[in-house]
Regions:
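C-terminal motif of bacterial Sec signal peptides marking the signal peptidase cleavage site
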Residues: 4-7
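Extracytoplasmic cell-surface/polysaccharide-interacting catalytic and binding patches
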Residues: 9-12, 16-17, 22-25, 29-141, ...
């Protein structure tokens, strides 16, 4: 955001209207006052995005650990995981819970896992969606490093040219954080003409996709990879992929038009780890 400080100077000019009153003889010659030289306005300067939310302290002088050894703190909902920044293969969140305790069976498989704060918020959001007559499904949630390796290898076989854009490399998937959900919609087959491809950019045209784009932030969820995010996330547009970041952050991202990786890129003083 550019803040331009401009100095405004008002000038008033007076004119004497002719009347029938005799003009008095001039007295002392008025002193001519020199016009002040206008002060140059300050050059516009970029103002950094405000750090509205606490981030884990990062010492610029500290030796950064390799990403393959990184384990986010338990209270860190904003850990950056992308094409560049990964996680320890053995990292498993400590508060994973079964979604079957929070969601109806028609929405998801009961043994799917998510971190407890995300699961609680998801339960409230899905309840609201069902009350609005929608039929969301949760197709994917927490994925371990090994699970992501299996998924990625499958895409390497099915679509090797685009596999890295479709599926994150193991250790570089937000799903390993345990705060991410992939949604489905019963309207997808009618839009894509396929019953075997549950994920599609056309999800944003479904009733569920439109509802999430409008309301997910109210429950603390934010779309991780919106259009144009591939430069930072490494992934193509994924309108079905939502990450729990907390209500305050999700509200800020929604209002500002930013996505999480973009926000972190603006405010982090140093890299979170060595790629």
């Amino acid at each position: 955001m550019l803040i331009i400080l401009a100095a405004c100077q008002s000038q008033a000019a007076s004119a004497l209207s002719p009347t029938n009153t005799p003009t008095p003889n001039p007295t002392t010659q008025p002193t001519v006052t020199s016009t002040p030289t206008p002060t140059a306005s300050p050059s516009p300067s970029a103002t950094p995005a405000p750090t509205l939310f606490p981030l884990p302290a990062l010492d610029p002088q500290a030796t950064l650990a390799p990403c393959e050894k990184r384990r986010p703190a338990a209270d860190d909902l904003l850990a950056e995981v992308s094409d560049n920044y990964g996680l320890d293969p053995n990292y498993v969140p400590g508060d994973l819970v079964k979604l079957g305790n929070y969601l109806p069976g028609r929405v998801t498989l009961p043994d799917m896992l998510l971190r407890q704060p995300a699961a609680q918020a998801l339960g409230k959001m899905v309840k609201a969606m069902l009350a609005d007559g929608l039929a969301p499904t949760v197709l994917s949630s927490y994925r371990s490093y090994f699970d992501q390796a299996v998924a990625h290898n499958r895409w390497l076989v099915e679509d090797p040219a685009n596999a890295n854009e479709i599926s994150a490399l193991p250790g570089h998937s937000e799903h390993q954080l345990g705060t991410v959900v992939d949604f489905g919609s019963p309207e997808i087959p009618g839009l894509t003409g396929s019953t075997t491809a549950p994920f599609s950019p056309l999800f944003d045209q479904t009733s569920e996709g439109r509802w999430l784009a409008k309301h997910a932030f109210e429950y603390g969820f934010s779309m991780s990879s919106p259009p144009g995010a591939q430069l930072l996330t490494g992934l193509a547009y994924e309108p079905w992929h939502y990450r729990y970041v907390g209500v305050e952050m999700a509200t800020y991202l929604h209002a500002s038009g930013l996505y999480l990786d973009q926000y972190l890129f603006k405010v982090r003083p140093v890299m979170p780890c060595l790629p």
